[in-house]
């Protein structure tokens, strides 16, 4: 009788035990598939220690009700979640997402991915994620505060600077972090770095806003350099017009490249003179307007409705908008136009088919869990500053970020070579992230 491989066994059991959680199934499958070469070399030991079963089962899952009173005096009830997935290499770390789509499966998918991303940073942080199905859109400041205070009143029992340090994610920005920090401090009577993404007046870090976009470019620059290319003088296409896209564009231009596009949910800009970052920030961060305003204010810019940035000829493509935004057709257009590298700024922006097509055609492809890890890396640097009760200058944080991103690239590169998948940075990232966690778990026994 053909026995199933250990990876297949674990996946089959995971799907059976966690029904109706497709996002979690997809994430576990993607990671475990790429870990096959490592698992095969250690199959007997891993199986005996149930290492993969322990890896895919969170250490702790917390689900709670969140009652709060709206502006009309009506009591509303939401559901809160915190999945503490793995603490082998440090306290749990991962964002809080407030969005109507949030359910346990989505939080598990994000928490599982976070284990490997956090491991790759080289910093001592474990994996976790949390959130609620609360929708901050259309709510008043008072309602958001009431919700955040109720949410933290329960969550505060499970977190702490040396236990679990949440951060922001979709629907959770500086305002929400502030309200939650205030409530934690009031209930626990502790002023500690229990959350990251804090304001600069109460323990936040300089360069955190820029971190994901800047980090993406430091990673891309190193990937190009190690493959005989130079970022300077290259034409770059960026999608998105949010935090990641803006600071990726700024850093690309500082490093001598020319960024010719940005996009938002309604359309995109082609600017052959190069995107004017200050104008883009004015339109998006100050006015919170559409890109039509950018085009109206700049002669060299053309505005196009709908999607289409990937049709523009470029050397480097940086998807920085949202998940599954770069499809197979887009990948074909990029390859036909001679693209050298694609690096993910958003989480999972490239579909599986598009990723495979790019890799088959010799394009250097950087997976988000490596190339956009600058955000969580800088969160860990914020934790360091809180522990030391001091704050570093912008340049100090930026220099540390650059070093971390270069190290992440080499960790992915080395792991891809070690297992015979040279230049496959997707496999490299998963293996490099896994090896550290697996070694730490093994050293700490069956816990």
Model-predicted regions and their roles:
Residues 196-199, 204-313:
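Glycine-rich phosphate/diphosphate-binding loop of Rossmann-like nucleotide-binding domains
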Residues 109, 163-167, 190-195, 238, ...:
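General beta-strand structural signal in soluble alpha/beta enzymes
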Residues 22-25, 41-48, 122, 159-168, ...:
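Flexible, glycine/charged-enriched surface loops at secondary-structure junctions
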Residues 3-27, 223-224, 335-447:
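Adenosine-phosphate binding glycine-rich loop
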Residues 267-365, 370:
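Rossmann-like adenosine-cofactor binding region
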Residues 45-74:
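Structured beta-strand/loop patches that form or line metal/cofactor-binding pockets in enzymes
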Residues 99, 118-232:
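Glycine/serine-rich phosphate-binding loop and adjoining beta1-alpha1 elements at the start
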């Amino acid at each position: 009788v053909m026995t199933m491989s250990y990876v297949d066994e674990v996946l089959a059991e995971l799907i059976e035990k966690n029904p109706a959680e497709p996002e979690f199934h997809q994430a576990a499958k993607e990671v475990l598939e790429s870990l096959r070469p490592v698992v095969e070399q250690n199959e007997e030991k891993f199986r005996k220690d149930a290492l993969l079963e322990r890896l895919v089962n969170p250490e702790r899952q917390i689900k709670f009700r969140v009652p709060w009173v709206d502006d009309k005096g009506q009591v509303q009830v939401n559901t809160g979640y915190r999945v503490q997935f793995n603490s082998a290499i440090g306290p749990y770390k991962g964002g809080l997402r407030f969005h109507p789509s949030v359910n346990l499966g989505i939080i598990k998918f994000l928490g599982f991915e976070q284990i490997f991303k956090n491991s790759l940073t080289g910093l001592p942080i474990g994996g976790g994620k949390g959130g609620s199905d609360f929708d901050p859109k259309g709510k008043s400041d008072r309602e958001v505060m009431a919700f955040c205070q109720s949410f933290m009143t329960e969550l505060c029992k499970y977190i702490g600077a040396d236990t679990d340090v949440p951060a922001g994610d979709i629907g959770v920005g500086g305002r929400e972090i502030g309200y939650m920090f205030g409530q934690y401090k009031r209930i626990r009577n502790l002023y500690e770095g229990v959350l990251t993404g804090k304001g600069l007046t109460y323990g936040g870090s300089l360069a955190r806003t820029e971190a994901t976009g800047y980090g993406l470019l430091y990673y891309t620059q190193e990937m190009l350099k190690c493959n005989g290319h130079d970022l300077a003088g290259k034409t770059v296409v960026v999608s998105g017009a949010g935090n990641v896209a803006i600071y990726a564009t700024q850093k690309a231009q500082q490093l001598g490249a020319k960024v010719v596009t940005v996009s938002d949910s309604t359309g995109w800009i082609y600017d052959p003179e190069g995107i004017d970052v200050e104008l883009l920030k004015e339109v998006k961060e100050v006015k919170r307007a559409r890109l039509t305003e950018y085009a109206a204010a700049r002669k060299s810019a053309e505005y196009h409705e709908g999607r289409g940035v990937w049709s523009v000829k470029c050397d480097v493509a940086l998807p920085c908008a949202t998940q599954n935004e770069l499809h197979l057709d887009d990948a074909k257009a990029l390859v036909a136009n001679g693209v050298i590298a694609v690096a993910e700024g958003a989480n999972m922006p490239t579909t599986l088919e598009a990723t495979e097509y790019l890799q088959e055609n010799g394009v250097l492809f950087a997976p988000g869990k490596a190339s956009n890890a600058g955000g969580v890396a800088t969160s860990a640097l914020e934790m360091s500053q809180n522990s030391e009760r001091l704050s570093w200058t912008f340049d100090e944080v930026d220099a540390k970020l650059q070093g971390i991103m270069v190290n992440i690239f080499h960790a992915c590169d080395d792991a891809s070579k070690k297992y015979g998948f040279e230049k496959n940075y997707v496999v490299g990232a998963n293996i490099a992230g896994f090896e550290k966690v697996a070694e730490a778990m093994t050293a700490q026994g069956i816990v």
